[in-house]
Design a protein with these regions (language model features):
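Primarily short, surface-exposed interaction patches in extracytoplasmic proteins
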Residues: 1-151, 156-158, 168, 174, ...
Length: 196
């Protein structure tokens, strides 16, 4: 029910965006599950996450993408349920070890015969370092901070464009000036020095 004080345009947009029958719901669900897949596997089912149109690349596994999108819609657009579905799949739970019998016919892992190794995000690296050292403060909620010495999870870092956190930038923290569909991945000497 639209709020009588507002025009109802945002509600109409949200309804259209999630309407799988007459709106953009099917496409929105495909885009969203592709982004989730990309987050967990470092590469989406569609490798151009910001372009599902004619200029983008076609999905490597279209049936899987459609099935995941339908599961997402059927779950009531429940992100937690989608993460659980992906993370409990046999594909996610595979070893990342190289198997010669599978590598010969599919050297680029197109058929996902192994879990693809990939770099962790800056936030995950920092949080794991704090957890392993026993310093991680697991307190939830509250204000963000610019204090590099804080021991809370990295999600609580405040983003200030003029005062970025050097460690995070060194580990490919995303540029806050633009919207990115994929994070840059670099391997440079300063990253190795940072980990010493």
């Amino acid at each position: 029910v639209a709020n009588p004080i507002t025009s109802g345009r945002r509600t109409a947009l949200a309804s259209w965006l999630t309407d799988a029958e007459k709106g953009a719901g099917r496409l929105a669900a495909r885009v969203m599950v592709n982004r989730l897949w990309q987050h967990h596997f470092a590469k989406g089912i569609v490798s151009t996450p910001s372009d599902f149109g004619a200029q983008g690349t076609p999905p490597t596994h279209p049936e899987l993408l459609d099935w995941l999108a339908q599961q997402f819609i059927d779950s009531g657009w429940d992100l937690k349920a989608m993460h659980r579905l992906i993370l409990t799949s046999a594909t996610w739970r595979q070893s990342s070890a190289l198997r010669e019998d599978a590598a010969e016919p599919d050297p680029h892992n197109h058929w996902l015969w192994r879990y693809p190794p990939h770099r962790l995000e800056a936030e995950v690296i920092r949080d794991r370092m704090l957890a392993v050292s026993g310093l991680l403060d697991r307190t939830m909620y509250g204000k963000g901070t610019l204090d590099e010495a804080m021991f809370r999870r990295s999600i609580y870092f405040e983003i200030k464009r003029s005062q970025l956190i050097p460690m995070m930038v060194q580990l490919n923290w995303p540029d806050t000036l633009a919207s990115l569909d994929q994070r840059a991945v670099t391997t440079v000497a300063p990253q190795a020095l940072l980990m010493m």
